[in-house]
Amino acid sequence: MQRRHVFTFQSRFVPMIINGDKHSTIRLPRTRVVAVGDIMDLRTWSGVPYRSKQTKLREVVCTEIHEITIREIYVFVSGRTLSYDEVAQLATSEGFRGIADMMLWFFANHSLPMTGTLYRWKS
């Protein structure tokens, strides 16, 4: 049975979601488990988070789920260490200007090391 899960995004990531350039998101573990095939309802806040309405950006189907660990100098996806080029590609696909931008964002928002889930979808 397909379940629906809401994912909210900061405004900096919205243009990439709307135009279809962003096909993944990295999140802390969720209480309600997402499965491949589930619907991901991608949204953003219209104003102040939790004090405004949510705006629906896209509705997509989850195609891949991987455990991800982001450390100060390494990134592991499903237990495999990513190469420098793979980390650079991940950072860009996640909407960051590069590896340093991604690492700073995760350090500021979650602290490092951070273990979570990488969700992927197709446009």
Could you say what each language-model-derived stretch is?
Residues M1-S123:
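Catalytic phosphate/metal-binding cores of nucleic-acid and nucleotide-processing enzymes, i.e., regions
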